[in-house]
Amino acid sequence: MAAVWREGDDLLLRLYIQPKASRDSIVGLHGEELKVAITAPPIDGKANAHLSKYLAKLCKVAKGSVVVEKGELGRHKQVRILQPSQIPAEIAALIE
């Protein structure tokens, strides 16, 4: 299964999250997932909130348009971005 795909106007991402990183970044493929490093710690939902904010900024959408569909409490997540205005090059290159 792909790490990144389109479903209608939405963008779906299968992610592996690295919390408490030195900076926010899209690292690249990690097996069949896209590895994303974020600075927030994995405590009390801070990592999910930070991930949503980071992806919203990259795709030029509101934070509410980034939905964690699976993996709320783990490092492996599936995220839906509703009607992204922009898709970063490192993500666009992986769309199947």
Curated annotation (Swiss-Prot):
Pfam families: DUF167. It comes from the Bacteria. One of its GO terms (cellular component) is cytoplasm. InterPro entries: DUF167 (IPR003746), YggU-like_sf (IPR036591). Belongs to the UPF0235 family. PANTHER family: UPF0235 PROTEIN C15ORF40. HAMAP family: UPF0235 (MF_00634). This is UPF0235 protein VCM66_0443. It comes from Vibrio cholerae serotype O1 (strain M66-2). The lineage of its organism: Bacteria, Pseudomonadati, Pseudomonadota, Gammaproteobacteria, Vibrionales.
